[in-house]
Amino acid sequence: MPLLDSFTVDHTRMNAPAVRVAKHMSTPKGDAITVFDLRFCAPNKDILSERGIHTLEHLFAGFMRDHLNGSDVEIIDISPMGCRTGFYMSLIGEPSERQVADAWLASMEDVLKVVEQSEIPELNEYQCGTYEMHSLEQAQDIARNIIAAGVSVNRNDDLKLSDEILGQL
């Protein structure tokens, strides 16, 4: 099985909260696609709550589009990581890590402005596979933690696992 890009970086050295360009690729027509690792928690040290990450999934996707989409950027998808330490965001375009970090922080401010659970988009059995597994309070706690900590940048060159280590794993 091929080694995926996300498993060639040393998770023990990742900062969080932090933005990392996980991958660059191009479509056959030449459009740039960028995948970002939006790391909310330090891997193997902390984890996002089940209800909090699920609620963020519903809120974050819209808020990030509000703050980042433009003439040269369009978000394709924002999905939670299975390890529950962050989200992957795929988009058309090549915004800087700083642009993404600023949009992320603005989105967290928006999460704090949501007043009631009923304001969470798609919070119903027709549009959500586990619509009862939400917590606005937990999502807002996560948002407050991100805002308080600020968002830094993780660079692949700083996190790259050596061929020697990869060979031993």
From Swiss-Prot:
It holds the Pfam family LuxS. Binds 1 Fe cation per subunit. Gene3D superfamilies: S-ribosylhomocysteinase (LuxS). One of its GO terms (biological process) is quorum sensing. Keywords: Autoinducer synthesis, Iron, Lyase, Metal-binding, Quorum sensing. Its cofactor is Fe cation. Signal peptide: none annotated. SUPFAM superfamilies: LuxS/MPP-like metallohydrolase. The keyword Iron applies. Its EC number is 4.4.1.21. It catalyses: S-(5-deoxy-D-ribos-5-yl)-L-homocysteine = (S)-4,5-dihydroxypentane-2,3-dione + L-homocysteine. The keyword Iron applies. Involved in the synthesis of autoinducer 2 (AI-2) which is secreted by bacteria and is used to communicate both the cell density and the metabolic potential of the environment. The regulation of gene expression in response to changes in cell density is called quorum sensing. Catalyzes the transformation of S-ribosylhomocysteine (RHC) to homocysteine (HC) and 4,5-dihydroxy-2,3-pentadione (DPD). Homodimer. This is S-ribosylhomocysteine lyase. It comes from Shewanella sp. (strain ANA-3).
